């Protein structure tokens, strides 16, 4: 009898030791799921154009446009308009961030937390295309968001230098498309959130996504970010992801 009980007790102990997210998430391992969902929107090697409209409580809107190029965990974002913001650029190489000031060759180190271009988009918002690089992920269950059936996840920052130590993310069950994210302060107060307002598909891939960032404390202040002409690439030159590239001033390699 004792011999029969030992395996059962061992199995029960092992089951209790498993984290709830690993045990309950219906689609298996969480990290591969999250990484696949990220890459479904923006492939590991890709380029796209981006337009951002900032709305302020003062009633003055601001518009800028540019492009970004992604190579796995490396991203470069370059403004092409308006003239006052031309050549403003952000470079992310893993955990290293650089900023190029508009209309100059000055390049400085910056951080994920800064909001170099202003508005509701931080440097990390413009260069974070791999969630698991910055956050550990736990499954919280299924929940409706924006009227859609979603998986809800809790993201905890791996690095204290990130602006938001805690994030909640909702991904639509049927499509694996992002629906909403809420960003919290250390004390648990919601600071901002984003909602995906529109997605355009071409066959089985995303070619355009419209995201609205909202200041949770001042909801009249928003940043509307549109990524369009999302194009998968077979190869991306390494030269784009260096400080020297930003300093060169030759920042319009979009057609390669």
PLM ranges: what are they?
Residues 1-7:
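Bacterial N-terminal signal peptides that target proteins for export
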Residues 7-15:
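Bacterial N-terminal signal peptides
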Residues 16-24:
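Boundary at the C-terminal end of the N-terminal hydrophobic targeting segment
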Residues 23-42, 49, 94-165, 240-256:
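Flexible, processing/modification-adjacent segments and terminal tails
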Residues 25-103:
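N-terminal mature ectodomain segment of secretory-pathway/periplasmic proteins
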Residues 83-85, 105-107, 116, 185-187:
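Short, surface-exposed beta-strand-loop junctions and turns on beta-sheet-rich folds
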């Amino acid at each position: 009898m004792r011999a029969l009980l030992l395996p059962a007790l061992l199995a029960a102990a092992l089951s209790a030791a498993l984290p709830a997210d690993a045990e309950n998430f219906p689609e298996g391992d969480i990290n591969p799921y999250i990484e696949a969902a990220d890459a479904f929107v923006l492939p590991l090697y890709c380029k796209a154009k981006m337009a951002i409209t900032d709305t302020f409580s003062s009633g003055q809107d601001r518009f800028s446009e540019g492009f970004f190029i992604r190579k796995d965990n490396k991203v470069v974002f370059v403004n092409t308009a308006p003239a006052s913001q031309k050549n403003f650029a952000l470079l992310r190489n893993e955990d290293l961030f650089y900023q190029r000031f508009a209309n100059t060759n000055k390049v400085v180190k910056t951080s994920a937390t800064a909001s170099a271009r202003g508005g509701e988009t931080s440097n990390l918002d413009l260069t974070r295309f791999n969630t698991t690089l910055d956050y550990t992920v736990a499954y919280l269950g299924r929940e409706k968001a924006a009227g859609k059936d979603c998986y809800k996840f809790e993201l905890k920052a791996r690095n204290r230098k990130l602006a938001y130590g805690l994030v909640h993310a909702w991904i639509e069950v049927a499509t694996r498309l992002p629906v909403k994210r809420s960003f919290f302060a250390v004390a648990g107060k919601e600071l901002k959130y984003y909602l995906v307002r529109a997605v355009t598909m071409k066959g089985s891939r995303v070619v355009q996504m419209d995201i609205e960032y909202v200041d949770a404390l001042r909801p009249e202040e928003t940043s509307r970010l549109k990524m369009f002409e999302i194009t998968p690439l077979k190869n991306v030159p390494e030269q784009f992801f260096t400080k020297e590239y930003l300093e060169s001033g030759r920042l319009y390699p979009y057609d390669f």
